[in-house]
Amino acid sequence: MIKLDILSDPICPWCHIGKTNLFRALQKHPDHPFVLEWHPFQLNPDMPEGGRDRRAYLEEKFGGKEGAVRAYAPVVEAAEAAGLTIDFEVIKVTPNTLDAHRLIHWAGLEEKQTHVVQALFEAYFEQGRDIGDIPTLIDIGVGCGMEREMLDRLFASDADREDIRARDAHARERGVSGVPTFVIANQHVLRGAQPPELWGQVIEEILEELNKQAGSDATAT
């Protein structure tokens, strides 16, 4: 199997689109060799813990309402092409995602990581839920099969806060400046929301190489 490390943030629309495109390719190639692991990268690491009003934040970031609309036009187009429903009007808060990344980390310990990542994307982009809010995160985790009592206990503590920050910082030190970023076998990097056709080509090339290696090994024995 081949490790596919994915650096992502659950409030990043390109990450949602990138995941959707990747999984469309994986569904077409059920024999794909990938084992997925999700890693933290905060788009807004300095966001206050309670988040900020999304409209005010975006208008400040992009120089007014028209600038924000222009900046998000390619996102809307790409989301439609991916078959996604993203309701930006329903999103009221831009949250700090540190606690969401803690949840993703804990989900990985139970092999529920991708399920939780998808649930976070849907909660934020389709339902407008505040995924910086701990009760909301606990509900999402429970909906993915995690234990409520365990999540209550973990979120009441500082468990893994510094670990998430350190992993985010390590990614930046390695040159990651945006997400999604996909790292194949700790060697090859793909940046951005790549189309499913490209992922299909990558999968086929890897499978071909693995088959060649298997043939060489069989010949050698």
Language model region names:
Residues 41-52:
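Short, charge-patterned binding micro-sites
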Residues 48-50, 94-98, 129-134:
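Short acidic alpha-helix initiation/capping motifs at coil-to-helix transition points
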Residues 66-99:
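Ordered, amphipathic secondary-structure segments that act as subunit-interaction surfaces
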Residues 50-64:
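A charged helix-plus-loop insertion that forms the helical arch/lid used to bind
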Residues 6-7, 11, 17-34, 38, ...:
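C-terminal cap of thioredoxin/glutaredoxin-like
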Residues 59, 83-89, 100-102, 121-125:
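Short, flexible active-site loops
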Residues 1-4:
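Glycine/alanine-rich phosphate-binding loops at beta-alpha junctions
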Residues 55, 72, 97-101, 113, ...:
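A general structural signal for well-ordered alpha-helical segments in protein cores
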